[in-house]
Swiss-Prot record:
One GO biological process term: chaperone cofactor-dependent protein refolding
Summary of the function given for this chain in its UniProt record: Participates actively in the response to hyperosmotic and heat shock by preventing the aggregation of stress-denatured proteins and by disaggregating proteins, also in an autonomous, DnaK-independent fashion. Unfolded proteins bind initially to DnaJ; upon interaction with the DnaJ-bound protein, DnaK hydrolyzes its bound ATP, resulting in the formation of a stable complex. GrpE releases ADP from DnaK; ATP binding to DnaK triggers the release of the substrate protein, thus completing the reaction cycle.
Native source species: Burkholderia pseudomallei (strain 668)
Designated name of the protein: Chaperone protein DnaJ
CXXCXGXG motif repeats mapped onto the chain: 149-156, 166-173, 188-195, 202-209
Domain notes: The J domain is necessary and sufficient to stimulate DnaK ATPase activity. Zinc center 1 plays an important role in the autonomous, DnaK-independent chaperone activity of DnaJ. Zinc center 2 is essential for interaction with DnaK and for DnaJ activity.
InterPro entries: DnaJ (IPR012724), DnaJ_C (IPR002939), DnaJ_domain (IPR001623), DnaJ_domain_CS (IPR018253), HSP40/DnaJ_pept-bd (IPR008971), HSP_DnaJ_Cys-rich_dom (IPR001305), HSP_DnaJ_Cys-rich_dom_sf (IPR036410), J_dom_sf (IPR036869)
Subunit structure, interactors included: Homodimer.
Localization: Cytoplasm
Gene label: dnaJ
Co-factor requirement: Zn(2+)
Length: 376
């Protein structure tokens, strides 16, 4: 099944700004997050689709490749043999363009030397709580990595032997191919651009010169980070080839849904049930915040759905000098499981309201005025 256009997935125009793309992704992520739709396969697919689209369009280089080449420009399966991670369209033509212009996508070659490639970037997905996002969080992660083989000390050759000059390219890493009037250089098919070959590979690393290991890294998550943001750890991606630089590690942050608060940028929203007596008579109520407790006064006659704004009780974002606000949406709660005495008191109260006329229930009067024509 063909992939949908990434801009179509997020519902934004092709010239959308980074903020518009981020806002569209946040809206879809909140709507389709698996934690909010635990039994919906359809929601899960929508969430994955939106996440993939955001990952591509929020990265300047990937977005440029996608705009020029479409899905082929960012498909990691279209790349040089053995490439992993963030390879793209240009990698598929690395050997050809690198040989002609002296530099491949993500790699280059010193004149007369072997092909040099930058290591692939790695991505690590991390879930944190809203509290950790608001206050900052230091943690450790374990990621797969590569280290020099301890048996051959990184040479790839069996102990007691050593790599030899490639007889096909004579150590150049490239061979010249001629066809008619054209002559181009290509990566040597025997040594794959290294300029050497290993007649007796190391049995431990199978000639690669490296072994897989798990590396522990310190990650400092800054206070105010938002869902979908990435933290870059330079040089902690996959190692380069033939002395090329290592790639980077990107830690992608995902914030778990909160039991009380819903985040909207630097602002927070929460639903607050209050007794109908407090709504009618007014009074002071206490609400939770990420920094502790806060209180505010509910005026007499507060209706269900009324929103109160507590300034500075939200989150201080990464690029903000002040914290956002907390919006408390009150829900007037109807009492249940009444005693006989309570029922009698409410009936007396109801009777006194009726005697007082519509001034006690202005919304009900307005509603009945609008619908009375249906009953005439």
């Amino acid at each position: 099944m063909a992939k949908r256009d990434y801009y179509e997935v997020l519902g934004v125009a092709k010239n959308a700004s980074d903020d518009e793309i981020k806002k569209a992704y946040r809206k879809l992520a909140m709507k389709y997050h698996p934690d909010r739709n635990p039994d919906s396969k359809d929601a899960e697919e929508h969430f994955k689709e939106a996440k993939e689209a955001y990952e591509m369009l929020s990265d300047g280089q990937k977005r440029a490749a996608y705009d020029q080449y479409g899905h082929a420009g960012v498909d990691p399966n279209v790349g040089a043999a053995g490439a992993q991670g963030f390879g793209g369209f240009a990698d598929a033509f690395g050997d050809i363009f690198g040989d002609i212009f002296g530099q491949a996508a993500g790699g280059g070659r010193a004149r007369g030397g072997p092909q040099v490639y930058r290591g692939a970037d790695l991505r690590y997905s991390m879930e944190i709580t809203l509290e950790q996002a608001a206050h900052g969080y230091d943690t450790q992660i374990r990621v797969p990595s590569w280290a020099a083989c301890g048996v051959c000390h990184g040479s790839g050759a069996k102990p007691g032997t050593k790599p030899e000059t490639c007889p096909t390219c004579h150590g150049q890493g490239t061979v010249r191919m001629s066809q008619g009037f054209f002559s181009i250089q290509q990566t040597c098919p025997k040594c794959h651009g290294t300029g050497t070959y290993i007649p007796e590979p190391c049995a431990h690393c199978h000639g690669s010169g490296k072994v897989k290991e798990t590396k522990t890294l310190e990650v400092k998550i800054p206070a105010g980070i938002d869902d979908g943001m990435r933290i870059r750890s330079a040089g902690n991606g996959e190692p380069g080839i033939n002395g090329g630089p290592s790639g980077d590690l990107y830690v992608e942050i995902h914030i778990k849904p909160h039991a009380v608060f819903e985040r909207d940028g630097d602002d927070l929203h929460c639903q607050m049930p209050i007794p109908f007596t407090t709504a009618a008579l007014g009074g002071e109520i206490e609400v939770p915040t990420l920094a502790g407790r806060a209180s505010f006064t509910v005026p007499e006659g507060t209706q269900s759905g009324k929103t109160f704004r507590l300034r500075g009780k939200g989150i201080k974002g990464l690029r903000s000098s002040i914290a956002g606000d907390l919006y408390v949406h009150v829900q007037v709660e109807t009492p249940v499981k009444l005693t006989d005495q309570q029922r009698d008191l409410l009936k007396q109260f109801e009777k006194s309201l009726a005697e007082g006329g519509p001034r006690h229930s202005p919304q009900s009067k307005s509603w009945f005025d609008r619908v009375k024509s249906f009953f005439e």
